[in-house]
Design a protein with these regions (language model features):
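Non-catalytic nucleic-acid substrate-recognition regions in nucleic-acid-modifying enzymes
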Residues: 2-152
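Class I S-adenosyl-L-methionine-dependent methyltransferase catalytic core
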Residues: 2-47, 55-61, 66-72, 152-156, ...
Length: 363
């Protein structure tokens, strides 16, 4: 084997062949815990009769067959990533080393790579025992056949392998990055939301082109940008007290080409100065800290910010908010029972991060 990924191509830029039509292939969308129903809803709206859902035991994945434009397949905003799936009727990975199976495997990987203009610079294998002698032999065979360096740590082409019901399931990711990685993000502001989580929050509000939206504590603008890329608005405001947040939001809205649709304001989220009931949708990415003394301070902060949100939101309007400080959130809402009614509460799981996401209705 070549020196385990040390060989490098000149970096290729993704060249997604959006015009290509895929025919009756199996795909797998990776989703975060707590978002499956929202992702399914987006898939059904966008892919419609061109998709057929497939039963699968993994709850953090959605499997389906699809025939149609690649562009539509990659337009899903709420999923983390999308893979092409291929089932091999083998009892163990070693069988892939046979000339017939390896030729089949390499041709399949090549066909997936071609969907993105052969933009991979290297590849890695995601599997139990990925550094075992058998897996390394498989990686070596793929590397030689595709002339693509194997990089077990940072390969941008991803091949997942695992046992399935009828043999082994192989999943090959489309593109060099997860779907949740957005090209519009020019400044990665500290604490910025995962963009797919933000898109899930947006769909929780049932976005409508007649909405008047404010994103309180907008940070780098992720929630606000995802809202504008999903549906039109009457007007939208991003609000943050931090000058660096305002700068980040400005840069990112420019990257998303929505800068003319947003008014970015630097002011105190507890006293915004806007008129009463001017908005019908409020989105809040609440800050949180892991240090105990700082978390105690969140209680009063959350109470004041969510009270201000109630002042800004018209009766019957909606609010979504996300935080990992469950105690401070519960404290604030217990003191604002006359202002808000909880319509949806869920915990979204992203590795060790388990924030509470709430949809509220103004009463």
């Amino acid at each position: 084997m070549k020196e385990s990924g040390r060989k490098r191509r000149v970096k290729n830029k993704p060249n997604l062949n959006y015009g290509v039509i895929v025919e009756n292939r199996r795909f797998c969308y990776m989703v975060l815990g707590g978002t499956r129903d929202i992702v399914q809803g987006e898939l059904r709206r966008k892919l419609r009769h061109q998709m057929k859902e497939l039963a699968h035991p993994k709850k953090d994945e959605i499997h389906l067959t699809y025939s149609g434009p690649l562009k539509r397949l990659l337009s899903i905003r709420t999923a983390q990533s999308v893979f092409v799936r291929r089932d091999f009727k083998i009892s163990r990975p070693r069988t892939l080393l046979s000339p017939e199976n390896m030729s089949d495997l390499v041709n399949w990987i090549r066909s997936v790579s071609q969907l993105t203009g052969n933009c991979w610079n290297s590849f890695r294998i995601d599997a139990a025992g990925s550094q075992s002698p058998t897996m390394l032999r498989i990686a070596d065979a793929i590397e030689n056949a595709l002339e693509l360096p194997y990089d077990p740590d940072e390969g941008d082409g991803v091949l997942a392998m695992r046992p399935g019901e009828l043999g082994w399931e192989l999943l090959c990711r489309i593109g060099t990055r997860p779907l949740a990685t957005r090209s519009w993000r020019k400044i990665d502001y500290r604490g910025s939301l995962n963009a797919a989580i933000a898109a899930n929050l947006v769909f929780m509000t049932q976005p409508d082109p007649g909405d008047r939206v404010i994103n309180i504590m907008c940070g780098g603008g992720t929630l606000l940008i995802e809202r504008l890329l999903i549906e039109k608005v009457v007007f939208a405001v991003g609000l943050d007290v931090s000058s660096s947040a305002v700068t980040a939001t400005s840069a990112n809205t420019l990257g998303a080409s929505v800068q003319n649709l947003i008014n970015i304001v630097r002011c105190d989220a507890k006293r915004s100065g806007f008129a009463n009931s001017i908005f019908n949708v409020v989105m809040i990415d609440l800050p949180y800290n892991t240090v105990g003394s700082q978390r105690l301070g969140n209680r009063e902060l959350y109470l004041q910010v969510i009270r201000e949100a109630a002042r800004l939101c018209e009766i019957g309007g909606r609010a979504v908010m996300i935080t990992d400080d469950h105690s401070a959130l519960n404290f604030a809402l217990s003191n604002l029972k006359d202002d808000w009614k909880v319509m949806d509460e869920r915990i979204i799981t992203q590795r060790q991060y388990r924030p509470t996401c709430l949809l509220l209705r103004r009463i």
